[in-house]
Amino acid sequence: MAQAAQINVLDISTRLRVEHDKKRRQFSIRLNGSHDKAVLLYEYVGKKTVDLQHTEVPEAYRGREIAKHLAKAAMDFVVEEDLKAHLTCWYIQKFVKENPHPQYLERILH
């Protein structure tokens, strides 16, 4: 039974596509083709500085590493755009702690 659940998690994560809406300042993932979506919100707080503020995954989809995909996309955006970032969101703080890549760490403002 546990093995089936593990396969299900992997199947879901391989089908995820993160969309970046720069106008609305959010990363999102549509979940199973439904209207449900997971989001990561950010704001510019300076010309080259963003505040990664909030990550939300609908309760029915939690525990499937969906937020991890959003956090990675957001941190990759920070790197690609050569930005600095405040990590207000606790989940992104956790993600960076678990994935302490130098290109992420050098862009975090404390």
From Swiss-Prot:
A UniProt-annotated Pfam family: Acetyltransf_CG
Superkingdom of this protein's organism: Eukaryota
Cysteine-cysteine disulfides: none
Domain named N-acetyltransferase: residues: 19-109
Stated family: Belongs to the NATD1 family.
Name of the featured protein: Protein NATD1
Naturally occurring in which organism (per UniProt): Danio rerio (Zebrafish)
